[in-house]
Amino acid sequence: MLSILYFFLGTSLGSFIGLICDRFPEKSIIFPRSHCNQCGHPLRFFEMIPILSQLFLRFKCRLCQSSIPYRYLFLELFCGGILLLYFYNYLDFGRTYLLFFSLCLTIFDLKNKSYPLLIWILGTLPLLCLGNHYLTFSLGISLAVLSYIKRLNIGEGDFLYLASVSLIFPFSKILIAIELACSFGLMYFLVRKNPNETVAFVPF
């Protein structure tokens, strides 16, 4: 029973992350209340139940019948799965939080090829309390500043994200993550349809 509660909490967090990524920074994440993006219909409580409401409504708005993107369902399922892993002790609290934070930045990066600095600051503050690799964190911040000044090929946001990750993971694992990200990024670079498209690094 408790595992179901954790899963439902995770799906709710996933729904909230989706709302943040849809609205911020152009709109308030508090007002107006959740609504259909097409017709503006304010959602009733039974239309905001994660996963179940989408299945019940068959991925369509109750009023205008416009389609609800499947990405919201996948996001809620993924976040529910993360909290289940935490519940069964496959993840500690720090890595669980980092996964949610990374997911939020990933969505922003995929949409805009960047993410709001305020989101990074607010998301990193708890990691400063949870982590202890402050030297590596300082190195990441320094590289971000250098990237901003010199306009390097790797954006400052990528270095800021690596700085956040370094608070939870040691430097050796950060290097492995960079190697894997560069490999996957290169593969995507080679097969992409638009040769002038900027590649978002955080998702990798």
What do the predicted segments below correspond to?
Residues 1-204:
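A membrane-topology feature that recognizes alpha-helical transmembrane segments
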